[in-house]
Amino acid sequence: MSVLENWDSWKNFLGDRLNYAQDKGMSQDTITDLATEIGSYLANEVESKNEQEKVLADLWSVASKDEQHAIANMMVKLVENNSTH
């Protein structure tokens, strides 16, 4: 099973990558910029595997560049908060 098929697995995967990036000294702005690029790739190239991803893809498709950046930033915050609880 791919990490994309289960929402909790996907968040855990992102949380692990986020912790690694932060441990290596990557800035929050750089992390959000990368999350925005990854979000664009996923929205355009990868089929949604669960309802949460479908909602994110739908939101992404109607969002402006600034709004996409905000969505990516919220995803970073979501996995950050999940990894601290």
Swiss-Prot record:
Please indicate which superkingdom the organism of origin belongs to: Bacteria
Q: Which InterPro entries match?
A: DUF3243, Uncharacterised_YmfJ, YmfJ/YflH_sf
Pfam families per the record? DUF3243
Q: What is this protein called?
A: Uncharacterized protein YmfJ
List the source organism: Bacillus subtilis (strain 168)
